[in-house]
């Protein structure tokens, strides 16, 4: 007689990190709680916050602990959906991309991909200058904030500041900016010196590996 493995599985409720008020974000089945640790949940920020204006933002949570049938997760990164980014492209304008690694005030190393669009085509020198301002804004916020607040600012959900809005304002001093975004973030290292995936005993996901 073939044993039905699904009957042995338990459904675990996944909670978002503290920065998202530990709301329920999904479920995952397993026949052993140890097998739950290290799994990555992909959802949208819109679903997490119950905000239809944020459905273009994918967020990734990695499970690091299980208590009973509750699984606790860490923020691992985010990414703007490709269709959304494509919708921002306009003819006769410039797209300015930049990727920078920063360390938050509490010791998290984060890779951040910024993105800006000008109202018209900018000169190469102007694009370089805007990128420099973009990096300056991101670095200053990282030095000023702990990890949770920095990510909230990247996602424009902080009550204090929005990094995309700061980039837009800083870039306008050089050339008019139509839109600025943080296209992607990825946690590279936690304060313990280990990559987050080693800290929870699992490999990094290919989803977050490419910039």
From Swiss-Prot:
**Gene Ontology terms: biological process:** translation
Name-wise, this protein is: Small ribosomal subunit protein eS1
Q: Which GO terms describe its molecular function?
A: structural constituent of ribosome
In Pfam terms, one family for this protein is Ribosomal_S3Ae
Q: Say which family it is in.
A: Belongs to the eukaryotic ribosomal protein eS1 family.
Q: Which GO terms describe its cellular component?
A: ribonucleoprotein complex; ribosome
Is Ribonucleoprotein among the key words of this record?
Answer: yes
Taxonomic lineage of this organism?
A: Archaea, Methanobacteriati, Methanobacteriota, Methanomada group, Methanopyri
Region feature (Disordered) = 192-211
Q: Which UniProt keywords apply?
A: Ribonucleoprotein, Ribosomal protein
SMART domains associated with the record: Ribosomal_S3Ae
